[in-house]
């Protein structure tokens, strides 16, 4: 596995840059196992979280009925009874974001530590790199689902309004134990974000950088830009792409590439779109545009609307027009 990742700085594809990150089969080495096992405990719950979010239908009908007939106690009880278990789910999603944040920080600690360069880390610790990719993949999928489900914020707003009304009237409320006021405030801020999981990762990465002052910020941002390069080259090099045994790996790679670009753009002082950026943005956008349009529109939108520096004056007109 030692030679799987090489020549990351080589951009001349005719020379055949030789690196491949095994997203499908990477297994932890002895030195990776401790962090790997900690992160794995979190990641094994990720698919269940996505399934719960995908099947989240909301209590819109019950809430509308209750609001339209404020004097009808039965309708009020019905709406409250529908919302309380949903808020339990929203609490579970929020708590998972906190666990994901801790997992990410563990991975960043391992993948940015001295004396190795980001390239060497990704080459030596492929299983941790794969977990980092899985966190990014989960994050984009979660935020895509959340963004298209207005019921989440409607349900939570109704829950908070009803709870405060019950408190004023001294009505005991089942469900209050589920989410106390301080937690409700934090959940409100989380769900008010267009892309709450990405914001969690971005804040966690920024915090990691500020708490590790002895570690140059480049160790972290270079880890991100290197991961973006790996994904781009694996996708645009037929020799590497043909090694994927599962078609899903292509969409996994695309999502990870976009996730890592967005994270880099939020964490790096000048962002991903500046001329000095270590990410080949034109190359990455071209790779996206070379896919079937309906499979990447969501990812292109993520670059358009959730990055931080796209509309800066320093961003080249060519990159902006590629994303129009």
UniProtKB/Swiss-Prot annotation:
Source taxon at top rank: Eukaryota
One record GO biological process: cellular response to molecule of bacterial origin
A Pfam cross-reference name: CYRIA-B_Rac1-bd
Membrane topology, from the record: Lipid-anchor
One annotated GO molecular function: MHC class Ib protein binding, via antigen binding groove
Expression sites by tissue: Expressed in pancreatic ducts (at protein level).
Placement of covalent cross-link Glycyl lysine isopeptide (Lys-Gly) (interchain with G-Cter in ubiquitin): 74
Maturation and modification: Ubiquitinated at Lys-74 upon Salmonella bacterial infection.
Signal peptide range: none
Cell compartment(s), UniProt: Membrane; Mitochondrion
Mutant phenotype after disruption: Myeloid-specific conditional knockout mice have a reduced survival following Salmonella systemic infection. Upon infection, they show increased levels of several serum pro-inflammatory cytokines and chemokines produced by activated neutrophils and monocytes.
Quaternary context: Interacts with RAC1 (GTP-bound form preferentially).
Similarity comment: family membership: Belongs to the CYRI family.
Protein name stated in the entry: CYFIP-related Rac1 interactor B
Organism, scientific name: Mus musculus (Mouse)
The encoding gene: Cyrib
